[in-house]
């Protein structure tokens, strides 16, 4: 979500000052275990993990899971930005708290090792080159939307029940009051409503629906930001930056600002495209069908790399998933 703030167009020097208010995590590129072949293949792409934590009000990010996982793919040569949402229940290879690798839900990676572990797991399982992450909780989303004066979204009929069912709980967690949504269609929603809109999934599209709504909110914030005065955006950043954790350095933030004029949003996608959703030993997972083929699809559609051959590491993980689940 910090990427939204970065692209808002805040004053260069003022933003440098505000950046010191971020919850900064120092990392090294070697921490992210990027395959050398992948690094070369994706040299024209900057991938940033945007992670929505399920940490409740008053809780820190450490030990929390990720309710939302979005990879922002920025093509350096064109400025095109694509958002790829990864299903939180995707059955992938992660590291546990003891640094042992195992197959599990990708959402658990953050609980075991924070943003670095999530990015490293995505890199290993999906042949990505992520070395930057932004972590936010639903309070940050709520505060951001409120500071922007609300956003316009199109509420569908199957979303209303979940919104009003989980809205009061979300409002309590983010420190606000929930106003029931009483109609479908385009309408302005406030912070607690937007945070709930991003979280719901039970009867409103499941995990893919949640990822889609998160991308809708990000796009709506972008649209609203383009219509907002700089002075208001400064107030937004002052309020929200302290709630956001990232390893993007101040230099990296300012470099992003300098590239803003060339940025354009392209097509958004949900990953995996083809998967088995069901119980394995009593636990629901989204099992890529197969991991290898889903990597090829991602490279073809997102990176314009037709005929991409996944790394031996990714193929090994794919075979392990097939052997463990029988899904292929």
Segments from the language model and where they lie:
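Non-catalytic, solvent-exposed segments at the cell envelope interface
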Residues: 1-2, 9-328
């Amino acid at each position: 979500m910090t990427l939204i703030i970065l692209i808002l167009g805040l004053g260069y020097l003022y933003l440098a000052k505000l950046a010191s208010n971020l919850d900064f995590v120092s990392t090294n590129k070697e921490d992210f275990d990027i395959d050398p072949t992948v690094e070369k293949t994706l040299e024209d792409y900057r991938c940033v993990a945007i992670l929505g934590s399920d940490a409740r009000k008053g809780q820190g990010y450490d030990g929390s899971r990720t309710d939302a996982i979005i990879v922002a793919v920025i093509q350096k040569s064109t400025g095109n930005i694509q958002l790829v949402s990864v299903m939180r229940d995707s059955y992938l290879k992660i590291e546990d708290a003891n640094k042992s690798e195992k197959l599990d839900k990708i959402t658990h990676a953050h609980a075991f090792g924070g943003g670095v572990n999530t990015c490293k797991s995505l890199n290993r399982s999906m042949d990505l080159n992520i070395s930057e992450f932004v972590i936010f909780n639903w309070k940050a989303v709520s505060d951001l939307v409120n500071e922007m004066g609300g956003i316009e979204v199109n509420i569908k009929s199957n979303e209303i029940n979940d919104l009003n069912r989980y809205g009061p709980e979300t409002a309590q967690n983010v420190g606000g009051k929930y106003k029931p949504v009483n109609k479908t269609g385009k309408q302005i929603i406030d912070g607690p409503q937007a945070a709930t809109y991003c979280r719901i999934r039970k009867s409103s599209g499941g995990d893919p629906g949640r990822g889609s709504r998160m991308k809708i909110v990000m796009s709506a914030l972008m649209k609203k930001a383009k219509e907002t005065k700089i002075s208001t955006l400064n107030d937004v950043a002052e309020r929200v930056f302290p709630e956001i954790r990232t390893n993007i350095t101040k230099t990296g933030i300012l470099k992003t600002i300098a590239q803003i004029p060339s940025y354009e949003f392209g097509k958004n996608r949900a990953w995996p495209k083809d998967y088995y959703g069901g119980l394995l030993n009593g636990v629901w997972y989204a099992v890529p069908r197969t991991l290898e083929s889903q990597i090829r699809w991602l490279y073809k559609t997102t990176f314009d790399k037709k005929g991409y051959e996944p790394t031996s590491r990714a193929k090994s993980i794919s075979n392990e998933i097939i052997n463990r689940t029988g899904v292929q």
